[in-house]
Regions:
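Short, flexible turn/loop "capping" segments at secondary-structure junctions
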Residues: 98, 130-132, 186-189, 245-251
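A generic structural signal for well-ordered coil/turn residues at beta-strand boundaries
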Residues: 102, 191-193, 221-223, 249-251
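Short, well-ordered beta-strand elements within core beta-sheets of diverse protein domains
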Residues: 136-145, 192-199, 254-258
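Conserved PLP-enzyme active-site core in the AAT-like
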Residues: 1-166, 171
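Glycine-rich beta-alpha junction loops
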Residues: 94, 157, 174-178, 199-201, ...
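PLP-dependent enzyme catalytic core of the Aspartate aminotransferase-like
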Residues: 5, 14-16, 28, 32, ...
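Conserved small-domain helix->loop->beta segment predominantly found in fold-type I
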Residues: 155-218, 239-240, 244
């Protein structure tokens, strides 16, 4: 969101931001100059789910390039290419790396598009050094078992939070109460390790200070459980009006669930 709002206009790129599955909204948003539909599912930090197959068909029928950021789901839980998406991107810093010690990214797609991406990378930089590649290879060996455990833990933790008196709302696509749970169930094998929730009466800073095992940090997807407040981190640079429009409340916390024992 920060990149779109603050950087794209510098390059003369126009954009329209949408936050729902209403095809009517997408129909209205598409202009003659529209080239790309960029999606994130689950989204950060509200864990909204997009019907990937429906959007792939929508883009294909209008000759639009479809791109899905699959970071929150990981390839273990969701494969947008199977539903017709043109390009899939991952922040390998997160679940693929899994140990909070890598800065990297992946792009998946057909050869034509990847050739363009590769040429752009050559022109602007972005090559990984050998040691980073070694760490990525190490991480891929444990990706499945890590994410499977994070799936299990997140479902248990989100179910606990949903019944807690101090919590006003829980966002996790694996919960039957999630507004897009049926869509998630259709296209995901697991629901990931990301949860967001809104506190009722507690201050978000005081709450984080009381935590013992869980540390405040801005990354995600690692083996350790960490927490952050979007209003103070990822969405801090947005105006209050922009955050309100996106549904980012001041009492919202984002939890990246690790592989510890869920009871802890």
């Amino acid at each position: 969101t920060n990149f779109v709002i603050q950087e794209l206009e510098k390059f003369g790129i126009e954009y329209t931001m949408l936050d729902n599955n209403s095809m009517g909204s997408f129909e209205e948003a598409v202009k003659k100059t529209t080239k790309i539909v960029y999606m994130e599912s689950p989204s950060n930090p509200l864990l909204s789910i997009i019907d990937i197959k429906r959007m792939a068909d929508f883009c294909y029928g209008r000759d639009l390039l479809s791109v899905v950021d699959n970071t929150f789901a990981s390839a273990v839980n969701q494969n947008p290419k199977d539903y017709g998406i043109d390009l899939v991107i991952h922040s390998a810093t997160k679940y693929i790396g899994g140990h909070s010690d890598i800065c990297a990214g992946f792009v998946l797609g057909d050869q034509k598009h990847l050739d363009q991406v590769r040429q752009t990378a050559l022109n602007f930089g972005g090559s990984l050094n050998p040691f980073m590649c070694h760490l990525l290879e190490r991480s891929l060996k444990t990706l499945f078992v890590r994410v499977e455990k994070q799936n299990q833990n997140a479902l248990q933790v989100s179910s606990f939070l949903e019944t807690h008196d101090s919590v006003d709302r829980v966002n996790y696509p694996g919960l039957p109460t999630h507004v897009e749970h049926v869509i998630a169930e259709k296209q995901m094998r697991g629901y990931g390790g990301m949860i967001s929730f809104e506190l009722k009466d507690q201050d978000i800073i005081d709450f984080q200070k009381k935590l013992k095992l869980i540390q405040p940090a801005i990354s995600l997807g690692g083996v350790e459980t960490i927490i952050s407040a979007p209003v103070l981190t990822s969405h801090k640079k947005l105006s209050k009006e922009q955050r309100k429009k996106e549904g980012i409340k001041d009492n919202l916390l984002r939890l990246s669930v690790g592989i510890e024992h869920a009871d802890d």
